[in-house]
Amino acid sequence: MSAARLSAVAQSTVYAFSARPLAGGEPVSLGSLRGKVLLIENVASLUGTTTRDYTEMNDLQKRLGPRGLVVLGFPCNQFGHQENGKNEEILNSLKYVRPGGGFEPNFTLFEKCEVNGEKAHPLFTFLRNALPAPSDDPTALMTDPKYIIWSPVCRNDISWNFEKFLVGPDGVPVRRYSRRFRTIDIEPDIEALLSKQPSNP
């Protein structure tokens, strides 16, 4: 493949991006996940849906991970300051507070990042441009302007915690879901993508 073609592919897929795991260490290149179906969510420890969404993310990773699903969580404090702890505090918050009861995520969590505005992680800028609005709620917007703490504000901004992006095994974003769309209800779309995977990803 020519260098120009490789560059074009990189710009149209998530494979050009990387992020540092919450546990530390070297950044993980999403290019290492070629052939996998990715479910990417911006998460928060103190949201009203934290327990529901985290447990459903764990459930999908446990059941569909062996078939090629990879769930990725990106903690973000831009929505109601609901991820206001330090990176090293997040896992304890999940374990002892919400969801609590010894909960441990079985999917990869990355370091805190911003998903909107000038300092947004490049992956989320790419995802928002590729899928400008949630498919289940195309008019989704931040409902209370006092919560907008980033600049510039764009029409394709993520509106709250736990928006979801589904990425196909070719690295191309397929569908965006609003915070109101339950994580577990994405399963049929994940199944459809898993059935299209190459036999040896």
UniProtKB/Swiss-Prot annotation:
GO BP: angiogenesis involved in wound healing; apoptotic process; arachidonate metabolic process; biological process involved in interaction with symbiont; blood vessel endothelial cell migration; cell redox homeostasis; cellular response to glucose stimulus; cellular response to oxidative stress
UniProt xrefs under PROSITE patterns: GLUTATHIONE_PEROXID_1, GLUTATHIONE_PEROXID_2, GLUTATHIONE_PEROXID_3
Tissues in which the UniProt entry reports expression: Expressed in liver and lung.
Keyword check for Oxidoreductase: yes
One cellular component (GO) term of this entry: Lewy body
Residues that bear N6-succinyllysine: 86, 112, 146
EC numbers: 1.11.1.9, 1.11.1.12
Keyword list, A-Z: Acetylation, Cytoplasm, Lipid metabolism, Mitochondrion, Oxidoreductase, Peroxidase, Phosphoprotein, Selenocysteine
Annotated compartments: Cytoplasm; Mitochondrion
Protein's recorded name: Glutathione peroxidase 1
Gene: Gpx1
